[in-house]
Amino acid sequence: MSTVPIESLLHHSYLRHNSKVNRGNRSFIPISLNLRSHFTSNKLLHSIGKSVGVSSMNKSPVAIRATSSDTAVVETAQSDDVIFKEIFPVQRIEKAEGKIYVRLKEVKEKNWELSVGCSIPGKWILHWGVSYVGDTGSEWDQPPEDMRPPGSIAIKDYAIETPLKKLSEGDSFFEVAINLNLESSVAALNFVLKDEETGAWYQHKGRDFKVPLVDDVPDNGNLIGAKKGFGALGQLSNIPLKQDKSSAETDSIEERKGLQEFYEEMPISKRVADDNSVSVTARKCPETSKNIVSIETDLPGDVTVHWGVCKNGTKKWEIPSEPYPEETSLFKNKALRTRLQRKDDGNGSFGLFSLDGKLEGLCFVLKLNENTWLNYRGEDFYVPFLTSSSSPVETEAAQVSKPKRKTDKEVSASGFTKEIITEIRNLAIDISSHKNQKTNVKEVQENILQEIEKLAAEAYSIFRSTTPAFSEEGVLEAEADKPDIKISSGTGSGFEILCQGFNWESNKSGRWYLELQEKADELASLGFTVLWLPPPTESVSPEGYMPKDLYNLNSRYGTIDELKDTVKKFHKVGIKVLGDAVLNHRCAHFKNQNGVWNLFGGRLNWDDRAVVADDPHFQGRGNKSSGDNFHAAPNIDHSQDFVRKDIKEWLCWMMEEVGYDGWRLDFVRGFWGGYVKDYMDASKPYFAVGEYWDSLSYTYGEMDYNQDAHRQRIVDWINATSGAAGAFDVTTKGILHTALQKCEYWRLSDPKGKPPGVVGWWPSRAVTFIENHDTGSTQGHWRFPEGKEMQGYAYILTHPGTPAVFFDHIFSDYHSEIAALLSLRNRQKLHCRSEVNIDKSERDVYAAIIDEKVAMKIGPGHYEPPNGSQNWSVAVEGRDYKVWETS
């Protein structure tokens, strides 16, 4: 699917130029940093920025002569040896606010025009269609030819895309006008607005904008103009579907006398990217043996360097001893903050750092305001220094990672890890034996699972500390697409943060893969480690969840080549990619002799033996289903050897051909989890998660407090996979719904004082979420309570489990708050097995302390973390939620 080329529409309409800020003449205050490290801290502050674009900057060689005072005297030194020089691209994201307007007016007698406009500059596309009289459902149709403005193109057979054009030079409004054909049987006009620059779709109250042209168009809360009389065109029954021309003309004149003009506005905000750069030069001063670092940037406004120094072969931040330069402050005894000096012309700022020659490097991030931190591709800026005069610092592209030899300590730890694994196996056998005895051993099994969790965490901790280290900066670009180390199959490292990279409407553009590529750097800088892509195969439904030919990877999201390029792009920025594998059902190519669709084509040309026998809709000759049936398509019989063989080959082919790192498994309730284990063993994913979604427990319409039966069903499925895949924590989502909506926060603690979802029983296999393409987006099957989304994210992004963030929420007004929570989770190294101590669970407030270094509360009630040996400071806060971290 292609989109409208609109290069002529103000191609650089929103390219910002940094305005020069004149603060008057200011004398330069040199920065002197005479550093002697004495305190070690963990690496701080993952950024909210993203990195693209490069710009050049002028630099002057400088040296700092040490004095007995607290400041230094700056003098030029042309003889300094350059040991490091780099220009880092950075990107700031700002929010522009404006409006979308819809106007209906009579331009001439009996000629009506509908205009849609936007006040924010950009490459705007109107994606629209119509509903005809007598239509049922929500599907669009294409409008009559004479209603299509110039420059419109057809999208398949259901929509039109028309570019908005700038009204006039110097005008900030973009608009498209549609001449209404009132002689046709069009009942309503439907549209969404798309920003070609960002790929964002703008809807009305979570649905399409709908402009009714008749009175009784169903109102789903998204009608425009109906309250002002628009739509008074007569009842549907009064407009014949087929008429001769003269009859239609007569009737349209009679029926459209009630048409009235209207004008409506809706607020809109757009995230705008501004490209800047940071230039860093490090020199060795031969006279003082100091390392002189120059940092220069064209970022506007006040820029603060949040920094630390490195030594002893690590990148851990260490705080120096005094003296500090002017405008430097201590941050939580973990880092220093130094405000850069403004340039004389006000366009950017710079600073000079004189560092001890024995140090190994300088780490820093940039702070622009309370919620804006900039780093480089999700990592701290790092300036390495020479360790000897004969070993120059290699650039990132030139370095090649070299594995270290195993030490005796590592070999010993490896043996100890094997002992732990043996113990875990024994515990698993213990669980199995209890099940075979058919005794009531639920509590025993739970205790065993908890013991396994502890042992697994211990083994993983040993693994992380003893795995041979590779240079973090020295990976060849050709090798970056396929990481050499896989920590485990199906369960990841424990520190994953998942981004769902699509919504229910993403297929409509036909170029979703290309749009995602443009967001790779930003998603990496936010701290995401895993991206979930939509189903890639040919599908009867455009969203991809009714697969047909599994080996045809040209879909409504893009071509197979675009898919492969997208995966490579995300690998390049350090993000793993999950494919959405629909294994439960498959749409047939041909009918059988009875006219039933159950014969398949393509490379996997199965017959009706591949279809389960107990679904009467599709007359399968396989065995009975091992799960629940999905009645919209033939359910596949996974008990058949040839089916499992073909699926395993297909998954392995997808891994090899596309480069997927793992799977999101659709509708796993439809077949036994043991088959999933078989598929995971064959494809060896880095991370895998299944969608096991069924109803929670209710009594007389009220949600039960105890949801153990619900989470037990999910845990049983995970057990059936032998833990080879995790599962979405539907239990936690459901309990959050009721707790937040009814102000019943006591629900968030189970009778044993633990989280009440899967995350409370098996956190390393629980993928927590608050929304996805089914529950939210334009489907809205189970939408999270409106206005309380950030409370949900404050919960899942601070708690154990693997959190998943929905695409629509990332690129919304919640962006900065979600980014701050992501930064906190990464900064404090929270993980899927983090320990939760629930401190409060009452009617109007829930509070917990995680790993003794993060405290959080949600709900309107009051809470402050307990005073003690820890010093708490507020890290993130918003409407009815607050998060603290230790200092």
Swiss-Prot record:
InterPro entries: A-amylase_bs_C (IPR012850), Glyco_hydro_13_cat_dom (IPR006047), Glyco_hydro_b (IPR013780), Glycoside_hydrolase_SF (IPR017853), GWD-like_N_Ig (IPR056301). Induction: Circadian-regulation. Expression increases during the light phase and decreases during the dark phase. Up-regulated during osmotic stress and by abscisic acid. Pfam families: Alpha-amyl_C2 (PF07821), Alpha-amylase (PF00128), Ig_N_CWD1 (PF23166). One of its GO terms (biological process) is starch catabolic process. Disruption phenotype: No visible phenotype under normal growth conditions. The keyword Chloroplast applies. Disulfide bonds join 499-587. It is an enzyme of class 3 (hydrolase). This is Alpha-amylase 3, chloroplastic. It comes from Arabidopsis thaliana.
